[in-house]
Design a protein with these regions (language model features):
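Metal-centered catalytic cores of metalloenzymes
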Residues: 2, 22-84, 88-174
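Bacterial Sec-dependent N-terminal signal peptides
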Residues: 1-13
Length: 174
């Protein structure tokens, strides 16, 4: 009888240890998924919904550091930039604004285009993301659920757009 009790305790201890090990491993996996800090979007008029006729194109990059997102957007073929936002939405879907990328920026005209550099924090969020932590945006950016939309006077709903993905990801950018 004593031998059976000891065997049961050993089995119970082994099961608890296994659960703790799986839990710790899973937590590490979740952290690794959300630890991506660099993101990129390739901007193009064919990605607009519906697509527009424009030769403009660009690249937007985002780097998360110390609860701040630093942004860089380089665009060619546009000189009259009137808006730049991150919005929620998958490829082919229009979504709701998350953050205005022109709120805190330094905008310079380049030969044949525009370069924008700036930053934002979670306090700049609007819409459904308002009041949420930066990690919520980080998670959405890592799963292709956000996009950048660039607006102009000729195309007030958007001239070029691109899905945000982790930098270096091999998944499609559009």
């Amino acid at each position: 009888m004593q031998h059976t009790k000891i065997l049961h305790l050993v089995i119970l201890a082994t099961a608890l240890f296994s659960l703790l090990l799986v839990s710790a491993t899973y937590s590490g996996y979740i952290y690794a998924q959300n630890s991506q800090t660099k993101f990129r979007a390739k901007l193009d008029s064919n990605n607009e919904v519906p697509p527009v006729n424009s030769t403009a194109e660009g690249v937007a990059t985002f780097k998360l550091k110390n609860n701040t997102v630093n942004t860089k957007i380089n665009i060619t073929g546009i000189t009259d930039l009137s808006g730049a936002q991150i919005l929620s939405g998958k490829k082919g879907e229009n979504g709701q604004p998350i953050v205005d990328l022109l709120k805190k920026v330094q905008k310079t005209k380049t030969s044949g285009g525009v370069a924008v550099e700036g930053s934002f924090t979670a306090s700049d969020f609007e819409g459904a993301m308002k009041g949420k932590a930066l990690s919520a945006l980080q998670s959405a950016m890592g799963t292709n659920e956000t996009y950048v939309n660039i607006k102009t006077k000729d195309h007030p709903d958007g001239e070029i757009r691109g899905q945000i993905k982790p930098k270096g990801s091999s998944s499609p950018t559009q």
